[in-house]
Amino acid sequence: MNPATRAALLRSLAPLALMGLIFYLSAQPSSGVHPWWEIIGRKLGHVTGYLLLTLLWAWALNGVARRPVLVAVAISFAYACSDEYHQTFVRGRTGTPVDVGVDAIGMAIAAWLMHRRPQAAKTEQFKDAGRSPTRAY
């Protein structure tokens, strides 16, 4: 087995563990917390969880997939859809397309952060050389 593939398999344990945690949490019935706090907490949890899941998948797939961020978003989106379907079987929970949209916000933030990171490094490289990254020399 290729060392890069082996490393990617080991790195994939982190996002798989997070997927297990998301599955466990989504299997919990609705709590008796004040509805507004529960809604805010769940939505923030959706954004944060899927932001982290997308980042972990991109990290796990780096060096193996041609476009690790795109593949990470696709995996995360598919999991968000399947998790919402899973919630339709949990008492007191509902699976909604709105929640998939909220999950997608986390995925979009992760993709933006991953896209922005190389740009920031490139800008610093040009600053160190005393040039502007927008001007061609």
Q: Where would I find each of the regions flagged by the language model?
A:
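"…centered on the first transmembrane helix and the immediately adjacent amphipathic helix/loop
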Residues: M1-A58
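Membrane-interface junctions at the ends of membrane-embedded or membrane-associated helices
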Residues: P3-A4, A60-R67, R116-E124
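Membrane-helix interface segments
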Residues: A7-L13, G32, V64-V71, T96-P97
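Small-polar-interrupted transmembrane alpha-helices in polytopic inner-membrane proteins
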Residues: P15-S26, V69-Q87
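Interfacial helix-loop-helix junctions of multi-pass membrane proteins
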Residues: G32-I39, C81-A104
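Short, conserved structural micro-motifs that define repeat-unit consensus positions
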Residues: R42-T54, S76-Q87, G95
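Membrane-interfacial alpha-helical segments at the cytosolic side of multi-pass membrane proteins
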Residues: G49-G63, I105-P118
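Short, intrinsically disordered terminal tails adjacent to the first/last structured region
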Residues: K122-Y137
